[in-house]
Design a protein with these regions (language model features):
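Bacterial N-terminal signal peptides
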Residues: 1-6
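A "functional boundary" signal
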Residues: 7-235
């Protein structure tokens, strides 16, 4: 009985710590938002530079996409759409494929799965250089990950694992992306291994960063798969 009470007290204390941490993040949200908006405005000022070339605009829009994609998806889509136009004007297949992958990822993130998949199916993988091929497999893996959550069907999570197999053959095995993909891959194959990797990533990642949010989001999927709904809610 004492052991059971101790476990409950520990769980309650852990939940309180998480709640307090979340409350602090919410209280400081306006600071983070202000810093983000200031950084975005500085980048936007570069679009007014005299003599700016189309390629220069493309690269500035790319920075704005990266700033906006986890902050304001509609704005990120706006700059990616513009980059697709630029890539066609410049007749640069690399830019076209890069921007198309970015657009597919954004569509997956906001639930526009049909449009996201149409884009992915239109890309000829045989024509992609190594870096874009890695991006392609990452984007397709993310597509199935988001889709499996939306329909609560583990079958689609297994399809995500199939694309991760291809990704593993290309990606740097010492990178954060590799470890993150590995943890997600094992959700459907070895839950203990998956949990071990997620815990390692959480231990070294700073709370509140975009990477931390990605880890907790994916870890919550593992909890859901294991039917540990209280732990899923916590993350």
């Amino acid at each position: 009985i004492a052991l059971g009470i101790g476990s409950v007290l520990y769980a309650n204390n852990e939940l309180k710590l998480l709640t307090d941490s979340l409350r602090r993040v919410i209280d400081e949200k306006h600071v983070f938002v202000k810093e983000k908006e200031d950084r975005i405005n500085r980048i936007k000022c570069m679009l007014r530079s005299p003599g700016l070339t189309l390629e220069g605009e493309y690269r500035i829009n790319l920075r704005l996409y990266n700033e906006y994609k986890k902050f304001h998806i509609d704005s990120a889509i706006h700059y990616v759409d513009r980059n697709i136009e630029i890539s066609r004007q410049l007749n640069r297949p690399y830019f076209t494929n890069q921007s198309s992958l970015h657009l597919s990822l954004l569509y997956s993130m906001c639930g526009r799965f049909r449009e996201a998949e149409i884009i992915l199916k239109s890309i000829k993988t045989s024509e992609l250089p190594r870096d874009l091929l890695i991006n392609y497999y990452q984007t397709y893996s993310s597509f199935w990950g988001h889709y499996s959550i939306s329909v609560a069907n583990n079958l689609y999570g297994k399809q995500q694992s199939a694309y991760q197999d291809s990704l593993f053959a290309l990606i740097d095995h010492t990178s954060w992306d590799y470890r993150m993909s590995q943890a997600s891959y094992y959700i459907w194959r070895d839950t203990l291994k998956s949990k071990e990797i997620f815990k390692e990533l959480l231990d070294i990642e700073e709370v509140g960063t975009p990477n931390y949010a990605m880890i907790t989001h994916s870890y919550s999927r593992l909890c859901h798969h294991q039917k540990k709904y209280d732990e899923e809610k916590k993350y």
